[in-house]
């Protein structure tokens, strides 16, 4: 297990994120962790009116580890993890700059604090 990777995400942050994913089994059908901080999630889609459908969809999520995520970091994440559609900040109190948010939007990505990510996961509005 690593202490830190190229993006400065500590093992404790990675482990906590995996625990969050594991505690949401009705929403996270499965996940695979690659490249240390890239997570390939299979998430349950919203069920139909009768709740009979059991479909899922996939999304790639990159985990950020700094207190403030900048535009340069978003560009770096995009270069390193081009399949990632979401960058999750590993702490609820962590921030991202408005420039980072604009850069992510231009790249077709979303920046989310951990609580925003879990809320989107719970409401099944992640993808």
Residue ranges and their predicted role:
Residues 84-92:
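Acidic beta-strand-to-loop metal/phosphate-binding motif
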Residues 39-78, 84:
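Conserved catalytic cores of phosphodiester-cleaving nucleases, focusing on short active-site segments
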Residues 1-47:
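Acidic-basic catalytic patches of nuclease active cores, encompassing PD-(D/E)XK
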Residues 101, 105-127:
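Charged, structured surface patches that assemble and position nucleic-acid processing machinery
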Residues 79-83, 105-108:
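Short, low-complexity, polar/charged sequence segments that are solvent-exposed and flexible
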Residues 70-72, 96-101:
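Short, well-ordered alpha-helical microsegments
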Residues 17-21, 77-78, 104:
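Hydrophobic, Leu/Ile/Phe/Ala-enriched alpha-helical segments that form helix-helix packing faces
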């Amino acid at each position: 297990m690593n202490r830190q990777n190229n993006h400065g995400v500590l093992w404790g942050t990675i482990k906590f994120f995996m625990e969050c994913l594991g505690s949401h089994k009705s929403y996270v059908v499965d996940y695979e962790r690659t490249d240390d901080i890239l997570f390939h999630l299979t998430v349950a889609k919203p069920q139909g009116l009768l709740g009979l459908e059991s479909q899922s969809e996939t999304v790639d999520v990159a985990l950020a580890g700094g207190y403030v995520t900048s535009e340069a970091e978003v560009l770096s994440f995009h270069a390193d993890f081009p399949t990632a559609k979401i960058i999750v900040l590993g702490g609820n109190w962590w921030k991202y700059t408005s420039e980072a948010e604009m850069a992510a939007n231009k790249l077709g990505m979303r920046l989310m604090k951990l609580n925003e990510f879990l809320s989107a996961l719970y409401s099944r509005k992640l993808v």
